[in-house]
Amino acid sequence: MLRFVLVYIPVSVVSHTLCISLFIICSTRHTCFSKRYTCLLNICFCFFISSRIRNYF
């Protein structure tokens, strides 16, 4: 339980914050379609990694 609190919560918060900030940067910047598409893929990958981290603990 202690490991869960000390590791899972900070990692989860950091990873989701990174994902959300990445999403905000992508949606606000005027990028061409291909860059935006890559950005969306990165966001999906980011959430996938964060969910995998959650499953690990």
From Swiss-Prot:
One of its GO terms (biological process) is killing of cells of another organism. The keyword Disulfide bond applies. Keywords: Antimicrobial, Disulfide bond, Fungicide, Plant defense. Signal peptide: none annotated. Disulfide bonds join 19-39, 26-44, 32-46. Belongs to the DEFL family. This is Defensin-like protein 302. It comes from Arabidopsis thaliana (Mouse-ear cress). The lineage of its organism: Eukaryota, Viridiplantae, Streptophyta, Embryophyta, Tracheophyta.
